[in-house]
Amino acid sequence: MPKTSSAKPGRLSSKFWKLLGASTERNQARSLSEVKGAADFEKKAADLDDEQLTKAAKLLKLEDLAGASDITQFLAIAREAAERTTGLRPFDVQLLAALRMLAGDVVEMATGEGKTLAGAIAAAGYALGGRRVHVITINDYLARRDAEWMGPLLKALGLTVGWITADSTADERREAYQCDVTYASVNEIGFDVLRDQLVTDVADLVSPNPDVALIDEADSVLVDEALVPLVLAGTSHREQPRVEIIRMVGELEAGKHYDTDAESRNVHLTEAGARVMEAKLGGIDLYSEEHVGTTLTEINVALHAHVLLQRDVHYIVRDDAVHLINASRGRIASLQRWPDGLQAAVEAKEGIETTETGEVLDTITVQALINRYPRVCGMTGTALAAGEQLRQFYKLGVSPIPPNTPNIRKDEPDRVYITAAAKIDAIVEHIAEVHKTGQPVLVGTHDVAESEELHEKLLKAGVPAVVLNAKNDAEEAAVIAEAGKLGAVTVSTQMAGRGTDIRLGGSDVGDDDAEKKKVAELGGLHVVGTGRHHTERLDNQLRGRAGRQGDPGSSVFFSSWEDDVVAAHLERSKLPMETDPDAGDGRIIAPRAASLLDHAQRVAEGRLLDVHANTWRYNQLIAQQRAIIVERRETLLRTDTAREELKERSPERYAKLAEELGEDAEERLEKICRLIMLYHLDRGWCEHLAFLADIRESIHLRALGRQNPLDEFHRMAVDAFASLAADAIEAAQQTFETAESVADEPGVDLSKLARPTSTWTYMVHDNPLADDTMSALSLPGVFR
């Protein structure tokens, strides 16, 4: 249940910190003493001119950050440089946050407390110690904004800074990665890693070896999007799903031909439904060996598209295209697709021409991408609530940073209603009442459909509201920045504009401005939530929009017994239904309503953690297999292993080619062998990924034969991978033996080794309906 006010945290036991995955108080106390010690050097730093300040920074000994004697001097120099270059003088709590990130923690800092500056100081500390730092953001807009904003500070400390966005060329990316500090979105860093797995010459590599990852909005990247696969795809001639099957499935009746579970996460054919589909398809047997992995899979995918995926909730249709909605950010995800057939099935369902799926050349989850870095740290407004996941999956601790000014936001108890309709009516009435006073209101909705419905009702009620749910990041930031203006009413999905402060009175209003004072007198920003999320952390992110840097503010959440989090996790028969008959608004008056909401949310959080853990075990298998492929590929790319192996396997062919190629035969043969070996390794990995995707789509059917789907998936995946190495080397030897000599470079005809004519990158949507429960065990040393 939300507290009525937020205050500065008191002393908590070391055991409590550990339970939350937080650093112990002893470490916090040491960092605090170092921050206080920086005051002894502030006058010396202030007396230095700009050139001397840069030299002083470069002379610091920060290689061993844990025991660095110069850390207090670094803090003083960084504070002085920040004030000179950005006009912002870091508070003690910002320096404390930087120190805890330098210790390898994720810090929790309230909205408006200056995470961007604290992160830049931490990045500078790592870079001055000789580390290469990637500051990882949730989108391109923030990557470029923060690099340009914090760039002068980093340059004043003698460091180089770069940024990468989707528009950056390969040369621009290489240049940015060569900088001491590089700002980039998690997507772009991941896509660069994937694209590097296609190069056949070391000179074409873009992404450097990972060193330090400093993650902004760490809970969003490390938890909400941890299991989202980033994908590199290439042109192929794979068959598209049959439109007639998708049309037939659309004619089936709920409850008669198919059933869904209580949470609407899964759908399956009934016996009657199976008979209908078999008849429509010419009397086939869906469960025969011929159709169980093909036709039945297509039907199941079409069922998911028709029944479980809802327009304006999971996706929108715009400009004759299906655009997915990112569940954790509540906004359009332009780079995301559903895997293979599901994307095409939704497009066919909406009467849109199906887009080319291509074949997956390589893939990596966000979690596996981040785990490549030897050092990971980060910052967010809601880290403690994600402490268990951060500890379990990344071995990260959490450091809560006290606010510079105590938080005086007032969080009202939930208002609970019997029906969703009654709840929406109450929300509109409440917003209209608050709007009459001029107090700005920010409304957080769960999806696009809800935000548009609420916006329409507000307009009918005479409330001029702005709806924000599907614009680009820069436009989102501009609109959100004005949500604190006098009389503003902004309806927004959960994550829209995250990373942008909401200043009372508007973005261009100073602290002493009359309009800011007027808004503060009215109570500051008022946040309205249209229902509990599946995790309290997301609720707190929304609440945290109000009460910035000691400003007044308030929040209230409206819920109903029909909300997803309640309907999926509480028995309706046990819910209190008492309402005030005089009010007639459907509001529940039972005192235990709020505690029931808390319980439903805790159950939801537990299930999400279980899904994350189970899916993580499945993804670990692919990550381990991919690591073996990457290691093998690096060896082939950077050494003469390919030439030596083919020379050993085909000595006569090698000798003949060496004679034909003349003086520079060894150099040319090294290139020829490398191209052949890399091609067949990449081809084998691509086909292996396609095999894994195929067995995943039908692995649950193993349960019909009383087999454990998880064990079966593991067995099949490991068996297939074990033969990948031998098959790739054998295919390479065959190509080497049969390739004809030519006069042109490289000396033999390799035209049959054609790579995709075009490639593209995308994210596989973090499907809220998925419930993967795969496992991973040890892998054989297939290339050893």
Swiss-Prot record:
Disruption phenotype: Not essential, the disruption mutant is super-sensitive to azide, export of some proteins is decreased and has a small colony growth phenotype on rich agar medium. It cannot replace secA1. This is Protein translocase subunit SecA 2. Keywords: ATP-binding, Cell membrane, Cytoplasm, Membrane, Nucleotide-binding, Protein transport, Translocase, Translocation, Transport. It is an enzyme of class 7 (translocase). Its EC number is 7.4.2.8. SMART domains: SecA_DEAD (SM00957), SecA_PP_bind (SM00958). It is a peripheral membrane protein. PANTHER family: CHLOROPLAST PROTEIN-TRANSPORTING ATPASE, SECA INNER MEMBRANE COMPONENT OF SEC PROTEIN SECRETION SYSTEM. One of its GO terms (biological process) is protein targeting. Monomer and homodimer. Part of the essential Sec protein translocation apparatus which comprises SecA, SecYEG and auxiliary proteins SecDF. Other proteins may also be involved. HAMAP family: SecA. It comes from Mycolicibacterium smegmatis (strain ATCC 700084 / mc(2)155). Part of the Sec protein translocase complex. Interacts with the SecYEG preprotein conducting channel. Has a central role in coupling the hydrolysis of ATP to the transfer of proteins into and across the cell membrane, serving as an ATP-driven molecular motor driving the stepwise translocation of polypeptide chains across the membrane. The keyword Protein transport applies. The lineage of its organism: Bacteria, Bacillati, Actinomycetota, Actinomycetes, Mycobacteriales. One of its GO terms (molecular function) is protein-exporting ATPase activity. Coiled coil: none annotated. It is found in: Cell membrane; Cytoplasm. The keyword Nucleotide-binding applies. It catalyses: ATP + H2O + cellular proteinSide 1 = ADP + phosphate + cellular proteinSide 2. One of its GO terms (cellular component) is cytosol. Belongs to the SecA family. It comes from the Bacteria. ATP binds at residues 94, 112-116, 501. NCBIfam families: SecA2_Mycobac.
